[in-house]
């Protein structure tokens, strides 16, 4: 155990290897959900300020960078899964010397990786936006916004990776607190830079840079003040190539999966665009209200990764089995019940998003097509997270990419071949969820780490 005082370990972190399984997973997932909601708040507040104060062109300039930003953040959220898995495993197994080296490795991975992205982004922002077909009327604004935004990459990458460490140690509340604090600063900075100094899209990017930097520094200070062995000491000499390769083994497949799925959504959006303005507006609203279901499922999956990682390290096979059953069966039942309730109250919810009755009616029809089958996504996410918790990320990536990019797009074109409609676009989603859930279940049974884990 490396001679470390376990009382300090208990004092500073939370363990998922003891106590009630279902309560531990749910209480751990709630702060993760809060963090996701605050991240959504960042972009929403930016668009509100820019749209109200600087008009359509400024909003479009930010939107033009949206896919690039989504891909980058999605990739490093995937990398954070890698940090989560191995930090949780070391923590659960009480391999404290390895945990210490891993944390230093994660820190310098974030700093160096973020710096490389910042330089690449600054130099190649015009090239990226050209590839995206950005309209000439907003091109200069989009370049200025993206270049300043890319300056925040060190902070964004470091925050995501170090938050993965804290989640692995069983602490999902601290990242939430710093995310919340960063969100408040983002709103305040938006007001100062946009309403007071009238800085336009540059002000929005600076607000993001400022708030993300504060959140990242907060996480670093928090880790620095912890007791050994999981304190951050900024020591590059303690970095480990082996730990770095372990992070990449899980993190890169998860990150690549996020990017490919994001890119596949361009094809789906192109089909939606052929259905007219009302359909485009309806799906825009749908993708907003869908977050009510989607974000809790993602939070549950993140909690499962930490839960499995810690218990795998500790050798608690029976506890993993119980957590697996609760997350999949309990999560599916809760998802189905929540979706049925949401369908009933959806007409009221939609009034907050649109005043157009045609858009509201079409959005409701889309919800009725997808929500009854959303439990498939819970099954998919939980099986996938279980496998990642075991350190197996490549095959889940293959299943998800083939299902979401292959079967979904194939189903979309088959359904749209005759009498295309928004309902048929919507139907391609549950088809791909069902295929992916079944394939992931088979994959889990065939690739589980021993009979005890099932």
Region annotations inferred by a language model:
Residues 1-29, 87-152, 196-252, 308-373, ...:
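Short alpha-helical transmembrane segments in multi-pass integral membrane proteins
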Residues 18, 22-41, 45, 68-75, ...:
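Residue-level signal for short hydrophobic patches within transmembrane helices
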Residues 27-46, 148, 159, 182, ...:
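Transmembrane helical elements of multi-pass membrane transporters/channels
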Residues 41-60, 129-136, 192-199, 259-292, ...:
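Helix-terminus/linker motif at the lipid-water interface of multi-pass membrane proteins
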Residues 56-67, 146, 205, 277-292, ...:
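Small-residue hotspots at the loop-to-helix junctions and early N-terminal turns
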Residues 59-119, 156-175, 282-346, 377-400:
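Small-residue-rich hydrophobic transmembrane alpha-helices
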Residues 71-74, 186-190, 216-220, 292-295, ...:
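Hydrophobic transmembrane alpha-helices of multi-pass small-molecule transporters
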Residues 80, 148-167, 175-183, 204-219, ...:
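Short runs within selected transmembrane alpha-helices of multi-pass transporters and secretion channels
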